[in-house]
């Protein structure tokens, strides 16, 4: 590894969430929740990522990252304070860029104010406009009804504070017929609250028949919808990414909520899951890659910063 090589890491901070999206793969069993890193170890992980593994882009995800520890917002803001010393906007080579992946329901204005200067991009998940469709997915119920109206208010507040805005959507049979209306909706406010990037995922099967039966989508149908979306967005300034199952499988190296990296590789025709030691036990990214037995070129394709 060249000492100048910098990397991006996706950190699933918690399996917990305030919503219950049916396609989500998070494990909320008592043992999984109990294994979440304590506050001090989260800070330790940040230091190791920055100093030892030369990570310069960190995506904070979940579950819902604003719900780490099962506590709304408080512990997440403590982590933000721990990240702040690694922000060096005057020196792009050493600046730790932060992306927050969230459903945005906990992103009140006072929370957003505390993210200024630390978080660079806020990525919001949005899968449909239709309230019934969102309810079927698990995004529009109880105290979180009116999901789309809340989303619109949130992005106005996010844009006002100068954050870059990105969207994530998962393409499934449940929302398949609603997606073009969603795209038209987003394009309608592009002049006032510009979305810079939008990523569309193919639902990833996890060998869970109860979920796969509902959410699995044929490769050809996924490709057809991606083509329709690309056509509709032609001429806009939104950078589109379409991530199918193969691309997701190839790029799947994540930092877990219990402080270890997980990755997958092929062995004798089987997909094998590998789990590292605690992240702070590694002195370099090369050491971590060897331990996980990942294809170094493939890893660098998705995780080395250009």
Predicted regions and their residues:
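Canonical Radical SAM [4Fe-4S] cluster-binding loop centered on the CxxxCxxC motif
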Residues: 1-42
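Short, well-ordered alpha-helix to beta-strand connector turns
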Residues: 6, 21, 119, 249-251
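A generic fold-level signal
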Residues: 3-5, 16, 52, 93, ...
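Residue-level recognition of short loop/turn positions
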Residues: 20, 62, 102, 257-258
């Amino acid at each position: 590894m060249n000492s100048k090589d910098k990397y991006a890491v996706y950190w699933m901070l918690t399996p917990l969430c305030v919503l219950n999206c049916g396609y989500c793969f998070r494990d909320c069993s008592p043992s999984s929740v109990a294994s979440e890193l304590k506050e001090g170890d989260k800070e330790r992980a940040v230091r190791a990522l920055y100093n030892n593994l030369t990570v310069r882009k960190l995506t904070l995800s979940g579950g819902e990252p604003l719900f780490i520890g099962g506590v709304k917002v408080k512990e997440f803001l403590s982590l933000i304070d721990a990240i702040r010393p690694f922000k060096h906007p005057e020196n792009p080579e050493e600046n730790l860029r932060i992306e927050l992946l969230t459903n945005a329901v906990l992103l009140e204005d006072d929370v957003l104010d505390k993210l200024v200067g630390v978080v660079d991009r806020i990525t919001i998940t949005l899968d449909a406009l239709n309230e019934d469709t969102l309810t079927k997915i698990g995004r529009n119920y109880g105290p979180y009804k009116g999901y789309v109206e809340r989303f619109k208010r949130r992005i106005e507040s996010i844009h006002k504070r100068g954050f870059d805005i990105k969207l994530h959507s998962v393409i499934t049979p449940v929302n398949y017929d609603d997606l073009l209306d969603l795209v038209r909706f987003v394009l309608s406010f592009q002049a006032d609250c510009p979305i810079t990037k939008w990523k569309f995922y193919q639902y990833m099967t996890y060998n869970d028949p109860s979920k796969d039966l509902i959410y699995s989508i044929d490769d050809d149908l996924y490709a057809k919808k991606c083509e329709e979306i690309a056509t509709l967005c032609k001429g806009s300034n939104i950078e589109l990414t379409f991530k199918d199952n193969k691309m997701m499988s190839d790029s799947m190296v994540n930092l877990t909520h219990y402080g270890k990296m997980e990755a997958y590789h092929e062995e004798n025709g089987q997909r094998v899951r590998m789990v590292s030691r605690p992240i702070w036990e590694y002195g370099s990214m090369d050491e971590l890659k060897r331990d996980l037995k990942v294809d170094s070129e493939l890893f660098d394709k998705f995780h080395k910063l250009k």
